[in-house]
């Protein structure tokens, strides 16, 4: 929330260009959702109730909410039937729901709006899985993914991170339900005839709509720490428990010390079916995580450190709009690496940052070094925030904070961290407020203040392309850089690879090695690529990070023996981190096969993933 007087809201335009709501006139403070999950019809039906506070004095004569592809049946204002109008659709933001008011509302007075609604088959936030798409193949499954602007396709709302509300969930389903609130233990049957139960949750900490989350299906739970549980398909529960129980509480204790203790009560992880498009989604109480975390070697759990860190950066202190997404993701990546340093040692933080720098360079190369989306603060007016999704806000944001840490010194920066998260707790802010808060905090420290005022903030915020590269500790990557060099010069040196080359390397070191190979000016030959896979056992790995990179190397080398396993991998996982680059690589090697594999699997992918892969393969024309 902007630090300003309430009266000024009526004259200030909203900070978020990706909402159609008039949230500068009214602000949601409490939302209650009552939904029936109808698996056979693949829709949600019910009502949503918003309590809104007036930010003007009798000025606004309408409430405008975001909505997208919804069937709206009825609207009540303060208990009385109201007219409403769905305005013409404005891509990519949906159809604004306009609710006229009989009279203006006095400053700080509240308004209750009750909307009867159902989702449609065009909903972009819901994914419905048939029993065949789940691991036990017994029951259907449903989950939500609302970030960035998809909550509006579940219910009308002020779909902006600049607004936060307390949420109550009352969800009727024939299968267990998980939501981004704390369970209220009075599960009741919907009716005497119904097999459904009503699952109730309460989220007492105000959250933005993109953190609204639900999942329902065949879900079982097990403890993974004193304040944590894992939820997963029953047949996967034990392996998920084993994967996460060694590190989750260690991560929590580490970040508790860096900022301040975790305030949400429980920290739990839901391992979703494989079509989930992200590594993780930081939904409060329950992180929604990709099954690629489960690598049977505990080496992909960095995702959990990242999503846990979101409990402070993003969920508690939030970017005011997606133009300032680095405030969520740059901070979270920075905190994730501080957790890893506390648990594994400082060199591991630098090792993770080196991997991140590689991802950043790839994003900048793909967009072009002058592209708007390679800036830290981006212009998203009229644009879809999903189109700007890349490693840039994560890694350029991390490097900015790492730069500030090195500029003023780690000890001083460490004192700012808890101050920042305390000052903006339960609020939303933009980059300019971040700048003013750090300058203000160090105003009495002449040395730090001089350093912070003398460097070029605008260059960091608005310059496209790569930032200055930090001086990373390369101790954990030197060994794999050396191995990559042997492969680079193999044809001249007669290098003969063997399994001993990779003995003792962790999965992330293999990933860095393969990343180095992938950027050779002269790619490996198909024969070399196949030899590497055979000698190092790469094709047999159960670690998705390793498989993803090995398949990219093989496709670039023209090694046709990796086409079939790549296609199988693409039919088994929907995480965009893997799916998008593999389709791009497959497209370069054999466009017909790439299109054939996509057409076969597109209904398996989440709508967000499906839409972005379509753009990668076909441009904006779709398939």
Curated annotation (Swiss-Prot):
Record GO biological process: peptide catabolic process; proteolysis
A molecular-function term among this protein's GO annotations: metallopeptidase activity
Catalytic reactions on record: an epoxide + H2O = an ethanediol
Entry cofactors: Zn(2+)
Highest taxon in the source lineage: Eukaryota
Keyword list, A-Z: Cytoplasm, Hydrolase, Metal-binding, Metalloprotease, Nucleus, Protease, Zinc
SMART domains: Leuk-A4-hydro_C
Signal peptide boundaries: none
Entry EC no(s): 3.4.11.-, 3.3.2.10
Region of interest: Disordered: 1-23
Cofactor remark from the record: Binds 1 zinc ion per subunit.
Subcellular location: Cytoplasm; Nucleus
GO CC terms of this entry: cytosol; nucleus
Gene3D superfamilies: 3.30.2010.30, Neutral Protease Domain 2, Peptidase M1, leukotriene A4 hydrolase/aminopeptidase C-terminal domain, tricorn interacting facor f3 domain
Listed PROSITE patterns: ZINC_PROTEASE
Biased composition regions of type Polar residues, renumbered to the chain: 7-23
UniProt: a peptide binding residues: 145-147, 277-282
UniProt: Zn(2+) binding residues: 306, 310, 329
Keyword hit for Metal-binding: yes
Catalytic residue list: 307 (proton acceptor), 394 (proton donor)
Function noted in UniProt: Aminopeptidase that preferentially cleaves di- and tripeptides. Also has low epoxide hydrolase activity (in vitro). Can hydrolyze the epoxide leukotriene LTA(4) but it forms preferentially 5,6-dihydroxy-7,9,11,14-eicosatetraenoic acid rather than the cytokine leukotriene B(4) as the product compared to the homologous mammalian enzyme (in vitro).
Family membership noted in the UniProt record: Belongs to the peptidase M1 family.
Protein name (Swiss-Prot/TrEMBL): Leucine aminopeptidase 2
Lineage, highest ranks first: Eukaryota, Fungi, Dikarya, Ascomycota, Pezizomycotina
């Amino acid at each position: 929330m902007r630090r300003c007087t309430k009266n000024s809201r009526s004259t200030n335009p909203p900070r978020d260009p990706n909402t159609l709501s008039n949230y500068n006139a009214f602000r949601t403070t409490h939302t209650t959702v009552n939904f029936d999950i109808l698996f056979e019809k693949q829709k949600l039906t019910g009502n949503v109730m918003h309590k809104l506070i007036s930010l003007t004095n009798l000025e606004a004569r309408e409430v405008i909410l975001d909505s997208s592809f919804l069937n709206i049946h009825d609207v009540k204002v303060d208990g009385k039937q109201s007219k409403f109008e769905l305005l013409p659709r404005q891509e990519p933001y949906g159809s604004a729901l306009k609710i006229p008011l009989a009279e203006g509302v006095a400053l700080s007075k509240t308004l209750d709006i009750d909307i009867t609604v159902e989702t449609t088959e065009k909903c972009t936030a819901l994914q419905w899985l048939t029993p065949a798409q789940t691991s036990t193949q017994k029951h259907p499954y449903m989950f939500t993914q609302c970030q960035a602007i998809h909550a509006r396709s579940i219910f009308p709302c002020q779909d902006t991170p600049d607004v936060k509300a307390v949420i109550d969930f009352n969800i009727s389903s024939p299968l267990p339900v998980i939501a981004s609130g704390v369970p209220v233990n009075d599960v009741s049957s919907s009716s005497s005839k119904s097999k459904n139960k009503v699952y109730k949750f309460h989220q007492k900490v105000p959250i933005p709509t993109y953190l609204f989350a639900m999942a329902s299906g065949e879900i079982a739970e097990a403890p993974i720490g004193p304040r944590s549980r894992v939820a997963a398909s029953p047949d996967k529960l034990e392996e998920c428990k084993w994967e996460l129980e060694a590190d989750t509480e260690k991560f929590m204790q580490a970040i508790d010390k860096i900022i301040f203790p975790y305030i949400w009560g429980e920290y739990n992880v839901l391992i979703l079916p494989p079509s989930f498009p992200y590594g993780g989604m930081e939904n409060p109480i329950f992180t929604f995580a990709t099954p690629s975390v489960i690598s049977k070697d505990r080496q992909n759990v960095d995702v959990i450190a990242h999503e846990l860190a979101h409990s402070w950066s993003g969920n508690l202190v939030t970017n005011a709009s997606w133009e300032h997404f680095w405030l969520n993701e740059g901070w979270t990546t920075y905190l994730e690496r501080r957790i890893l340093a506390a648990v594994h040692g400082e060199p591991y933080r630098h090792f993770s940052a080196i991997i991140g720098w590689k991802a950043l360079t790839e994003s900048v190369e793909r967009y072009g070094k002058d592209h708007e989306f390679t800036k830290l603060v981006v212009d998203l007016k009229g644009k879809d925030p999903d189109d700007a999704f890349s490693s840039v806000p994560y890694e350029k944001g991390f490097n900015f904070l790492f730069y500030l840490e090195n500029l003023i010194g780690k000890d001083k920066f460490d004192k700012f961290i808890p101050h920042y998260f305390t000052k903006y707790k339960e609020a939303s802010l933009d980059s300019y407020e971040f700048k003013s808060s750090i300058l203000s905090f160090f105003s009495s420290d002449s040395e730090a203040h001089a350093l912070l005022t003398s460097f070029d903030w605008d260059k960091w915020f608005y310059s496209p392309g790569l930032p200055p590269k930090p001086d990373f500790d390369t101790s954990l990557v030197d060994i794999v850089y050396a191995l990559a060099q042997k492969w680079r010069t193999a044809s001249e040196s007669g290098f003969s690879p063997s399994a001993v080359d990779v003995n003792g390397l962790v999965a992330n070191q293999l990933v860095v090695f393969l990343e180095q190979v992938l950027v050779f000016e002269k790619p490996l030959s198909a024969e070399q690529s196949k030899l590497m896979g055979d000698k190092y056992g790469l094709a047999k790995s159960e670690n998705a990070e390793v498989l993803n990179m090995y398949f990219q190397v093989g496709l670039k080398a023209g090694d046709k023996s990796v086409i079939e396993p790549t296609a199988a991998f693409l039919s088994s996982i929907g995480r965009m981190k893997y799916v998008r680059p593999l389709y791009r690589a497959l497209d370069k090697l054999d466009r017909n096969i790439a299109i054939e594999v996509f057409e076969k699997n597109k209904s398996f992918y989440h709508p967000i993933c499906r839409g972005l892969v379509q753009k990668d393969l076909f441009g904006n024309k779709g398939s």
